[in-house]
């Protein structure tokens, strides 16, 4: 792992940080003295899981996010939610935060559902990004979707500046 200027970053396991258990979330955040929650947990792959098992998609991407927002509000913590730019129709690319939303697939609908909870809480930031790894291994994901990718490591480099913002950033 590359070092960043960010300090005291924790990556808890599912066992120690259960997003379906409000008490588990609260205990962990208090114990570790967390000030900002970067919510990257999500059901994403395989993409067709969102069509085959809708309840899994709802639980992990909507209910889990709602639980995190509830606890962040209780503890007055900032939450940064990693959403997706798939919440846009995907016809033109380079979307602005104010462009109309029309999720491309069930995965995007589930991420938009999570966004709804996050937007209700004012001490929050939603990042609508499409992250991928280096080297870029997905020569194609969708043949009829225009999107902008960003590499994981580039998102991490931006966090020191992003944590000051609230609202939505593409």
For each feature predicted by the language model, list its residue ranges:
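Substrate-positioning beta->alpha
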Residues: 138-167
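NAD(P)H-binding glycine-rich loop region in Rossmannoid oxidoreductase-like domains
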Residues: 22-61, 71
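Conserved Rossmann-fold NAD(P)-dependent oxidoreductase catalytic core, especially the SDR/UDP-sugar
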Residues: 66-102
């Amino acid at each position: 792992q590359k070092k960043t200027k960010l300090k005291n970053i924790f990556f808890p396991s599912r066992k120690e940080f259960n997003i379906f258990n409000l008490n588990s979330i609260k205990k962990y955040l208090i114990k570790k003295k967390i000030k900002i929650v970067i919510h990257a947990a999500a059901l994403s792959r395989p993409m067709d899981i969102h069509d085959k098992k809708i309840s899994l998609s709802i639980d992990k991407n909507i209910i889990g996010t709602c639980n995190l927002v509830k606890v962040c509000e209780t503890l007055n913590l900032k939450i940064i939610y990693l959403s997706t730019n798939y919440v846009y129709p995907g016809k033109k690319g380079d979307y602005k935060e104010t462009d109309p939303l029309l999720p491309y697939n069930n995965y995007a609908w589930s991420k938009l559902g999570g966004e709804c909870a996050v937007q209700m809480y004012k001490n929050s930031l939603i990042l609508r990004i499409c992250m991928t790894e280096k080297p870029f291994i997905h020569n194609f994901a969708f043949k009829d979707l225009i999107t902008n990718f960003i590499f994981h490591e580039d998102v991490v480099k931006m966090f020191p500046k992003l944590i000051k913002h609230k609202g939505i950033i593409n």
